[in-house]
């Protein structure tokens, strides 16, 4: 028989793995290098019936330690935060919402998949909140009844009984019994104490009788315990098979699934049981049990056997369940088996049931793992995008944003264009905001060639970079100190779209020139853009440039005259004059002739503002520059020299009274 053949191979493998001395070679389990992505395509060869098993070094860790929600899958964040986040998210959703569709959409958008383990953790946290617990339990019961195990039922009984909901407690007991689940001692003790405290003697007696009968019956939980004890205790053989048969139990899907999952710590024995029960005609495997076996074998050491089970399951017309995908792909990514994770993604996406297809969040997490791998394999990226979009799914800005963030985290921003090209083949066109983000990240990192390639790529796609994206290029080059390239991009932007939205990027350009001590070049740039392209700089741009032109060294070399020439341009653009830097200049080094030039620049209808005149004189005299103030007064026209306010200022701020800031001025 075929069963006898694979059993002998399994046992032979087991004996070899328990020899006292092993060669280094015998301790290494070979991992098939073949891809099983072809399983989803027609023309697949006949299913291999024999299982090639290799020696095992140690039992596998319990699957209970694996992540149960999509939000945890592939994540590079700390595990503790993710686990608590999934439970908190579920509790928040069921505390706020009541509609089935609302809840389903919220769970999907949060990237949470309800599994048996996650359901149990949520119920434990809701022990003192029976209303939300009932809502949550009822929703799972209707939406995913297969995710309710004996432990889940017992936890719900504990909540109902512990909160005095006696009728609902007994109602759930009846439902639970029909499903073959038994009452746990923990529930008996907890609820029994509550019944006794509330004086519910008849209910207490009924509870005790129920537990006694459960200990003697063939509930799924009890049968599972007995089968697992037999299988785990001894080496597999005729005696083990006979003892399991002698239990005289009817094996149903939930029971077989439970046993296989319980044997997770011994994957080899789980597979022996799985094969034997089918070959012995005790049970015909279905989608539920195949997936349970796949979850147990979905580990690096059992890769070949996992692949065989998946092929067999698909050939039988069954699909990879979402929980299987999440658990196994998580393990694959944790052990750097990125190619195998993509293979599994292709198979899971090929399923006809949308509820079993990996979610957009799953897809995003897989792409993030691909781009942060030791070597970025664009073929894997392309395969994942292709199979995802083939199912009618759309690629989004939020997806690309998340993937690019991961790409930057491993300092591969220069490969952004490669990702973008692959996504374009999937029908994706980046929005203006995404264009800006990509342009900024490339130029800030000084990746000129890649930035040029990005611009060319967008133009060849018939989608020229919009003004915001071009501005981001300019800003990025400014931040990286590449002023020449920043200027080229700015002029290209103005040539393509005009100056309507160029004011912010122009300010960045001016500031970058100033920071590079090229202030006068910034002035020339502003003058040229205003004259040639009718650019209207921001008021803040004028302020920054004027302030920098009036620094001591630059002002002496012609900066003062240039700053002065900006005042009428500011006025033409509707901005008030910015005179504070001029006052600072006159208080220290400004000459009387320069002050007169400033007053002329501030003249309106042939008369300067008297308030400005008074401020200039006062600034000079407060700084003990009385001689410069007198020289300026002598250069002013009569209407200023004879102005009462001016005369009063000079009378009250005589040298011996006004030299408060510079005592040495008293000797001037």
From Swiss-Prot:
Assembly mode: Component of the mitochondrial ribosome small subunit.
Is Manganese among the key words of this record? no
Q: PANTHER family under this entry?
A: OS01G0970900 PROTEIN (PTHR47003), SMALL RIBOSOMAL SUBUNIT PROTEIN MS81 (RPPR8) (PTHR47003:SF3)
Tell me, in one coarse class, where this protein mainly resides: mitochondrion
The protein's name in its UniProt record: Small ribosomal subunit protein mS81 (rPPR8)
Sample GO molecular function, one term: mRNA binding
- Species the sequence originates in: Arabidopsis thaliana
Family named by the database record? Belongs to the PPR family. P subfamily.
Q: Which residues form the signal peptide?
A: none
């Amino acid at each position: 028989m075929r069963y006898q053949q694979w059993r002998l191979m399994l046992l032979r493998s087991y004996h070899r793995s328990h020899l006292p001395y092993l060669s280094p070679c015998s301790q290494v389990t070979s991992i098939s290098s073949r891809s099983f992505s072809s399983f989803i395509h027609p023309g697949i060869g006949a299913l291999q019936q024999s299982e090639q098993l290799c020696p095992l070094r140690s039992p596998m860790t319990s699957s209970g330690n694996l992540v149960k929600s999509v939000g945890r899958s592939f994540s590079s964040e700390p595990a503790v935060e993710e686990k608590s986040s999934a439970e908190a998210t579920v509790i928040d959703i069921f505390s706020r919402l009541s509609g089935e569709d609302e809840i389903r959409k919220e769970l999907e958008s949060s990237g949470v998949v309800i599994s048996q383990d996650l359901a149990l953790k949520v119920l434990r946290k809701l022990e003192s909140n029976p209303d939300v617990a009932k809502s949550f339990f009822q929703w799972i019961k209707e939406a995913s009844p297969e995710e309710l195990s004996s432990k889940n039922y017992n936890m719900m009984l504990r909540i109902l009984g512990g909160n005095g909901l006696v009728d609902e407690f007994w109602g759930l007991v009846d439902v639970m019994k029909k499903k073959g689940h038994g009452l746990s001692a923990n529930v008996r003790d907890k609820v029994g104490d509550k019944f006794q405290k509330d004086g519910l003697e008849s209910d207490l007696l009924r509870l005790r009788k129920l537990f006694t009968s459960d200990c003697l019956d063939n509930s799924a939980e009890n049968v599972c315990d007995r089968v697992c004890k037999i299988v785990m205790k001894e080496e597999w053989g005729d005696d083990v098979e006979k003892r399991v048969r002698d239990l005289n139990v009817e094996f149903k899907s939930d029971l077989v699934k439970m046993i296989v999952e319980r044997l997770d710590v011994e994957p080899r024995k789980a597979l022996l049981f799985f094969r034997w029960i089918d070959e012995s005609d005790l049970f015909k495997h279905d989608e539920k049990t195949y997936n349970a076996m796949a979850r147990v074998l979905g580990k690096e050491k059992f890769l070949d056997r996992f692949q065989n089970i998946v092929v067999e399951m698909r050939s039988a017309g069954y699909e990879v369940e979402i929980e299987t995908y999440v658990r196994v792909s998580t393990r694959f990514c944790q052990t750097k088996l990125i190619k195998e994770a993509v293979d599994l993604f292709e198979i899971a996406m090929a399923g006809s049931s949308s509820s079993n297809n990996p979610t957009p969040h799953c897809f995003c997490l897989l792409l993030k793992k691909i781009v942060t791998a030791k070597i970025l394999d664009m073929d894997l990226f392309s395969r994942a995008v292709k199979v995802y979009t083939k199912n009618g799914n759309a690629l989004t800005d939020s997806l690309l944003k998340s993937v690019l963030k991961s790409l930057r985290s491993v300092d591969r921003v220069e490969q952004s264009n490669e990702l973008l090209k692959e996504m374009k083949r999937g029908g994706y066109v980046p929005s203006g905001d995404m264009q800006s983000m990509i342009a900024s990240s490339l130029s800030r990192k000084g990746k000129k060639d890649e930035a040029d390639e990005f611009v060319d790529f967008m133009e060849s796609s018939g989608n020229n970079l919009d003004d915001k994206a071009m501005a981001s290029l300019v800003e990025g080059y400014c931040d990286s100190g590449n002023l020449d390239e920043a200027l080229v991009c700015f002029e290209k932007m103005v040539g393509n779209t005009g100056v309507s939205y160029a004011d912010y990027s122009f300010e960045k350009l001016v500031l970058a020139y100033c920071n590079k001590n090229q202030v006068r070049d910034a002035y020339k740039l502003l003058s040229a853009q205003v004259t040639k392209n009718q650019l209207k700089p921001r008021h803040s741009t004028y302020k920054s440039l004027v302030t920098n032109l009036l620094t001591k060294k630059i002002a002496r070399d012609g900066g003062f005259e240039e700053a002065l020439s900006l005042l009428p341009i500011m006025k033409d653009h509707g901005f008030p004059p910015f005179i504070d830097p001029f006052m600072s200049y006159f208080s220290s080094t400004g000459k009387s002739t320069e002050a007169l030039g400033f007053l002329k620049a501030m003249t309106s209808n042939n008369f300067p503002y008297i308030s400005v005149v008074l401020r200039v004189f006062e600034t000079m005299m407060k700084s003990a520059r009385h001689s410069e103030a007198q020289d300026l007064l002598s250069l002013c026209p009569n209407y200023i020299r004879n102005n009462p306010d001016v005369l009063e200022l000079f009378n009250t701020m005589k040298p011996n009274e006004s030299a408060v800031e510079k005592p040495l001025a008293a000797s001037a």
